[in-house]
């Protein structure tokens, strides 16, 4: 099972190396790593290019935001399963992808999610919030629960069939996609009771007030 990991980046020179290194350190061999840079001006692209030959695909061109960049990555991906690692984040350890693949093979799931840690951006050893996904129930989605987006791994054919990220949402396109997939996709969903990712606090995607405002605009 090939896993495509997509990282979008714009002016993240301070953190992009951690993200890249955590992908390259994975002990699973069949990984396609795609980095989509939005024409960064802070040295991010120069850091990314240090890893040419180890990153499967590097795209650098202006875009209209993170979700357009992610969609570009998905369209060129060739993996059986697609996951995201944001440029501020890094994997929990080097066995994450191996455990994801094993669990998806065992359960034959279309969609997997796991647990995550929110960490202090200045001291990533300091955990700010421990996010535990818990067992999947559709009624939980109907009542506003969603899996933690950076822990989600989805079969590529599902994404091609159900559609990619809605680029008109500048903050919560990930939430719109998850609601759409889980509510209308008829998917086999599984929960991996393992930590997948460490997320630095402070980005738009971790601002709960802004996300709640955007979620109120989502219509399925």
What are these regions (language model features)?
Residues 1-208:
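Nucleotide-sugar donor-binding/catalytic module of glycosyltransferases
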Residues 215:
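Active-site-adjacent helix/loop segment of glycosyltransferases
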Residues 219-220:
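Conserved small/polar residues in nucleotide/adenosyl-binding loops
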């Amino acid at each position: 099972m090939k896993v495509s990991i997509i990282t979008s980046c714009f002016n993240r020179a301070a953190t992009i190396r951690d993200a890249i290194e955590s992908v390259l350190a994975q002990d699973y061999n069949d990984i396609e790593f795609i980095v989509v840079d939005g024409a960064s001006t802070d040295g991010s692209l120069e850091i990314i290019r240090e890893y040419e030959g180890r990153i499967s695909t590097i795209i650098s061109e202006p875009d209209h935001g993170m979700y357009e960049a992610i969609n570009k990555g998905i369209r060129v991906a060739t993996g059986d399963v697609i996951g995201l690692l944001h440029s501020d984040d890094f994997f929990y350890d080097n066995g994450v992808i191996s455990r994801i693949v094993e669990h998806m093979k065992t359960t034959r799931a279309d969609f997997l999610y796991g647990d995550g840690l929110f960490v202090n951006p200045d001291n990533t050893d300091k955990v700010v919030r421990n996010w535990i996904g818990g067992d999947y129930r559709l009624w939980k989605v109907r009542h506003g629960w969603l899996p933690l987006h950076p822990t989600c791994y989805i079969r590529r054919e599902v994404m091609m069939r159900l559609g990619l990220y809605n680029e008109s949402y500048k903050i919560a396109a990930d939430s719109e996609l998850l609601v759409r997939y889980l509510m209308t996709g008829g998917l086999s969903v599984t929960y991996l009771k393992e930590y997948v990712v460490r997320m630095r606090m402070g980005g738009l995607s971790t601002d709960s007030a802004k996300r709640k405002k955007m979620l109120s605009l989502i219509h399925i």
